[in-house]
Amino acid sequence: MINEDSIQLEALLKKYYEHSIEKIVFADDSGKIIAMNDAAKDILSEEDNYSAVANAICHRCEGYTNAYDVQSCKDCFLESMQVQATNFQVFMKTKDQKVMPFTATYQLIDQDRGIHAFTLQNVSSQIEQQEKLHQQRMMRKTISAQENERKRISRELHDSVIQEMLNVDVQLRLLKYQEDTAKLLEDAENIEYIVAKLIDDIRNMSVELRPASLDDLGLEAAFKSYFKQFEENYGVKIIYTSNIKNTRFDSDIETVVYRVVQEAILNALKYADVNEINVGIRQTGRHLVAEVIDAGNGFDPSSKPKGSGLGLYGMNERAELVSGSVNIETKIGEGTNVTLNIPI
């Protein structure tokens, strides 16, 4: 092991400074750049050299990643002691005007002389790879959500529409052998009733799949129409509150909010055993929040979900497609609260 005070270690550190792909900049206690290696000259040009470090860096900085945004100048890392105590991601403009992401440090290395070191490591390839992996995950989630939707539609077609159509088919076949005119008319009226119900079922299914009002008028109108139909069909009252009025959001976000709320309501209908369900939609700052609350049976979150379990799984899958999250608070006998939170 090389002695920390040895000339050999100093030589190695000098070689690292001169030949490293890591960009290294030193500034004195007045903020003036006193040295930078060749790698740093991709960022700080000769005209920036020996100027105030804040001016030189700010001239090239496009923001760093913090709690507020991916690229922000709020609580600048040059001034924040909390940021300086950690590695952070910063976006810098190179001399050829390309904005590149870097892992950076900005720390005091010589307290007596007030010398700071600013280091940058290019992470473009890592971020590009992460984005590819993220896109692949999102694609898998999208396909999974589509498959779950197809399964749901298949079940509904089999359990309602196809069964009714088979019933009509049987009754139509029997009409051929019916000689009693009065009974024939009675059977015909019954078939008319079944066909009318079948039309309603298909219309309702069409609305559930993609209501025209969602595309044309937005969430507020789509929900009011859906809740009215829901109350008529199932006799369960929906207490709806909202502050979004006629505000429109990205189409993908509106679809996710509509689907998650719809799924949460249907789950409450199937398992909660309640006469009313509370639904709230609100925009708070840079987030869109949807809540579905019932005071019904509740369930044990650690137990296996009732039914297929695709409902709860599908809600999370959908939310992740728009960088959102679903939180479910429930307890047996105390109801369920489903909260969807989406950044906008």
Swiss-Prot record:
Binds 1 [4Fe-4S] cluster. One of its GO terms (cellular component) is membrane. Gene3D superfamilies: 1.20.5.1930, Histidine kinase-like ATPase, C-terminal domain. The modification Phosphohistidine is found at residue 158. Keywords: 4Fe-4S, ATP-binding, Cytoplasm, Iron, Iron-sulfur, Kinase, Metal-binding, Nucleotide-binding, Phosphoprotein, Transferase, Two-component regulatory system. [4Fe-4S] cluster binds at residues 58, 61, 73, 76. This is Oxygen sensor histidine kinase NreB. The gene is nreB.
